UniProtKB/Swiss-Prot annotation:
InterPro entries: NAD(P)H_OxRDtase_bac/plastid, NADH_UbQ/plastoQ_OxRdtase_su3, NDAH_ubi_oxred_su3_sf. Its main location: membrane. It is a multi-pass membrane protein. This is NADH-quinone oxidoreductase subunit A. It holds the Pfam family Oxidored_q4. Belongs to the complex I subunit 3 family. The chain crosses the membrane at residues 9-29, 68-88, 96-116. One of its GO terms (molecular function) is NADH:ubiquinone reductase (non-electrogenic) activity. The gene is nuoA.
Length: 128
Protein backbone atom coordinates (compact mmCIF):
# COMPACT_ATOMS: atom_id res chain seq x y z
CA UNK A 1 0.00 0.00 0.00
CA UNK A 2 1.36 3.39 -0.98
CA UNK A 3 1.34 6.27 1.45
CA UNK A 4 -0.01 9.63 0.29
CA UNK A 5 3.53 10.98 0.10
CA UNK A 6 4.60 8.12 -2.16
CA UNK A 7 1.53 8.65 -4.33
CA UNK A 8 2.34 12.30 -5.03
CA UNK A 9 6.11 11.85 -5.35
CA UNK A 10 6.09 11.33 -9.16
CA UNK A 11 3.96 14.45 -9.59
CA UNK A 12 6.38 16.46 -7.45
CA UNK A 13 9.34 15.15 -9.45
CA UNK A 14 7.66 16.04 -12.76
CA UNK A 15 6.84 19.51 -11.44
CA UNK A 16 10.42 20.06 -10.26
CA UNK A 17 11.81 18.88 -13.60
CA UNK A 18 9.47 21.21 -15.50
CA UNK A 19 10.31 24.23 -13.33
CA UNK A 20 14.02 23.41 -13.45
CA UNK A 21 14.01 23.01 -17.22
CA UNK A 22 12.16 26.30 -17.67
CA UNK A 23 14.63 28.07 -15.35
CA UNK A 24 17.62 26.61 -17.21
CA UNK A 25 16.21 27.66 -20.60
CA UNK A 26 15.50 31.20 -19.38
CA UNK A 27 18.96 31.50 -17.85
CA UNK A 28 20.66 30.22 -21.00
CA UNK A 29 18.67 32.58 -23.20
CA UNK A 30 19.58 35.47 -20.92
CA UNK A 31 23.28 34.57 -20.86
CA UNK A 32 23.80 33.45 -24.45
CA UNK A 33 21.31 35.67 -26.27
CA UNK A 34 22.53 38.72 -28.19
CA UNK A 35 21.75 42.16 -26.82
CA UNK A 36 21.50 44.70 -29.61
CA UNK A 37 18.66 47.07 -28.70
CA UNK A 38 17.45 49.41 -31.40
CA UNK A 39 14.52 51.71 -32.01
CA UNK A 40 13.00 49.30 -34.50
CA UNK A 41 13.11 46.42 -32.02
CA UNK A 42 11.52 48.58 -29.34
CA UNK A 43 8.43 49.49 -31.38
CA UNK A 44 5.31 47.40 -30.80
CA UNK A 45 4.53 44.90 -33.54
CA UNK A 46 0.91 44.70 -34.59
CA UNK A 47 0.46 42.36 -37.55
CA UNK A 48 3.15 44.11 -39.54
CA UNK A 49 1.47 47.51 -39.26
CA UNK A 50 2.76 50.51 -37.40
CA UNK A 51 0.62 51.51 -34.42
CA UNK A 52 -1.64 54.44 -35.30
CA UNK A 53 -3.21 55.11 -31.91
CA UNK A 54 -2.20 54.71 -28.29
CA UNK A 55 -2.69 51.30 -26.73
CA UNK A 56 -4.76 52.72 -23.87
CA UNK A 57 -8.30 53.02 -25.16
CA UNK A 58 -11.55 52.97 -23.28
CA UNK A 59 -13.73 49.98 -23.96
CA UNK A 60 -17.47 49.91 -23.72
CA UNK A 61 -18.85 48.41 -20.54
CA UNK A 62 -20.65 45.86 -22.71
CA UNK A 63 -17.37 44.04 -23.30
CA UNK A 64 -16.91 43.54 -19.58
CA UNK A 65 -20.51 42.46 -19.05
CA UNK A 66 -20.22 39.89 -21.82
CA UNK A 67 -16.94 38.68 -20.30
CA UNK A 68 -18.64 38.23 -16.92
CA UNK A 69 -21.53 36.38 -18.55
CA UNK A 70 -19.05 34.11 -20.30
CA UNK A 71 -17.38 33.33 -16.98
CA UNK A 72 -20.74 32.57 -15.33
CA UNK A 73 -21.79 30.16 -18.06
CA UNK A 74 -18.33 28.65 -18.23
CA UNK A 75 -18.54 27.88 -14.52
CA UNK A 76 -21.96 26.37 -15.17
CA UNK A 77 -20.40 23.99 -17.67
CA UNK A 78 -17.78 23.04 -15.09
CA UNK A 79 -20.57 22.10 -12.68
CA UNK A 80 -22.51 20.17 -15.32
CA UNK A 81 -19.71 17.75 -16.22
CA UNK A 82 -19.35 16.02 -12.84
CA UNK A 83 -23.11 16.02 -12.42
CA UNK A 84 -23.53 14.24 -15.74
CA UNK A 85 -20.95 11.65 -14.74
CA UNK A 86 -22.43 11.00 -11.30
CA UNK A 87 -26.14 11.09 -12.19
CA UNK A 88 -26.55 7.43 -13.09
CA UNK A 89 -25.28 4.53 -10.99
CA UNK A 90 -22.03 2.93 -12.14
CA UNK A 91 -19.15 0.86 -10.72
CA UNK A 92 -20.72 0.43 -7.30
CA UNK A 93 -21.62 4.11 -6.97
CA UNK A 94 -25.37 4.50 -6.32
CA UNK A 95 -25.76 7.65 -8.42
CA UNK A 96 -27.40 10.93 -7.50
CA UNK A 97 -30.93 9.81 -8.26
CA UNK A 98 -33.88 12.15 -8.39
CA UNK A 99 -32.45 14.49 -5.76
CA UNK A 100 -29.43 15.21 -7.95
CA UNK A 101 -31.61 15.58 -11.02
CA UNK A 102 -33.95 18.05 -9.32
CA UNK A 103 -31.15 20.08 -7.74
CA UNK A 104 -29.36 20.43 -11.08
CA UNK A 105 -32.67 21.31 -12.71
CA UNK A 106 -33.09 24.16 -10.22
CA UNK A 107 -29.50 25.27 -10.88
CA UNK A 108 -29.96 25.29 -14.66
CA UNK A 109 -33.38 26.97 -14.36
CA UNK A 110 -31.81 29.75 -12.29
CA UNK A 111 -29.13 30.27 -14.93
CA UNK A 112 -31.68 30.24 -17.74
CA UNK A 113 -33.74 32.82 -15.84
CA UNK A 114 -30.60 34.96 -15.55
CA UNK A 115 -29.95 34.57 -19.27
CA UNK A 116 -33.51 35.59 -20.11
CA UNK A 117 -33.16 38.59 -17.80
CA UNK A 118 -29.96 39.87 -19.42
CA UNK A 119 -31.42 39.18 -22.85
CA UNK A 120 -34.54 41.23 -22.04
CA UNK A 121 -32.39 44.04 -20.59
CA UNK A 122 -30.55 44.25 -23.93
CA UNK A 123 -27.12 43.34 -22.60
CA UNK A 124 -26.51 41.00 -25.52
CA UNK A 125 -27.70 43.53 -28.12
CA UNK A 126 -24.74 45.04 -29.99
CA UNK A 127 -26.79 47.25 -32.33
CA UNK A 128 -26.02 50.58 -30.65
Amino acid sequence: MLTPLQTYFPIAVALLVAVGLAAVMLALANVLGPRRPSEVKSTPFECGSLPVSPARERFSVKFYVVALLFIVFDIEAIFLYPWAVLLLPSDGYPGLGWAGYISMGIFVATLVAGLVYVWKKGVLDWAD
